[in-house]
Amino acid sequence: NAEPDVLTSGKSLGGGKASISAYTCKEKIFKKSYDNLRDATLHSTTFNALGEETMTAIEAINIIIEDNYLKKSKEIFNILNPGLIELKKKYPNIISDVRGSGSLNGIVINTDFTDKYFLPLIKLIPSQFTKDDYAFKKIVVSSIISELYDTHKILTFYGSNIDLPLKISAPIITKKEYIDYFLSSLDKTLSMGLIKLITKFIKK
């Protein structure tokens, strides 16, 4: 139930048409930061006050409110998150954490392999990739992404933070049967085991 003092937004604010972002904060924060001649323009940008982008953003906000995107994202979360938690219980050696809120969720994949399994696989990886400190972690997550796409036609991606979570970004129009299909497909994919998934991915 945290209430932020500062909120930034972008991407969907442009309604898929305009490039626009916004910075919103509480009045007391705004006054403390900008309510003087020296700092009054600190929050401005080179490209601002463009009428078409502003109108697009206003209409995007209207649609978000009128179509109740918040309710829809919560409905997605209430199906997807428990399903991911169940998969974590089923595959505790593969999924180390479940994260997210609304329609954006993710699972952290355990990449803590022993040398017994790691060393034979590392020999299959092209040398230019092994210079990246996160190379093996990326390959592990990418092997799951690849299988989900090739076999089940599901597009996922990994995040950019240190844990490189497998991100599931469900469209707001997603129906329950699609979420169920995703969870079933992820279950089938993880049941193959990471060693088989990684070997298949590297060979491909």
Feature map (PLM): residue ranges:
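Conserved N-terminal phosphate-binding loop of PLP-dependent enzymes in the Aspartate aminotransferase
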Residues: 1-204
